[in-house]
Amino acid sequence: MKTILVDDMLLDLQLFELKCADMPDFEIVGKFTDPNAAIEYAAGHVVDFALLDIDMPGMDGIHLAQALRRLRSDIIIVFATAHPKFAVEALKMKADYIIFKPFDREDI
C-alpha cells in the first residue's frame, strides 16, 4: 500500500517511518510535518494508507483525514495519538483504526 506519514514532531515522524520501513505491505511514498503538504501530495498521487498524528498545530489530524477522504474515499486512515481524548473524534469521522503512542509495529 502506498503510505503517507504525517506528524508535526520530526522525531515521531522518524519513529513512524522506522516502524513501517520493513513491513512488506507498506511503501512509504511521503513523510510530512505539514498537513497541507500531505494534502497537496495526495491530490496528485495515489495514497492508499495514511498514518496520522491527531494533535498538530494549524490543521489537526481529524481535519487532515477529512480532506484526504474527500480526495479518495477508500483511503485507510490510522490515527496515532498520545491523547485518548481524541479517540471519540476519530471514531466520529470513521477512522479505520486508532493507536496510542508509544506504539509497537504490531499495532499498525
Place the predicted regions along the sequence by residue.
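Two-component/phosphorelay signaling modules centered on CheY-like receiver
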Residues: 9-30, 70
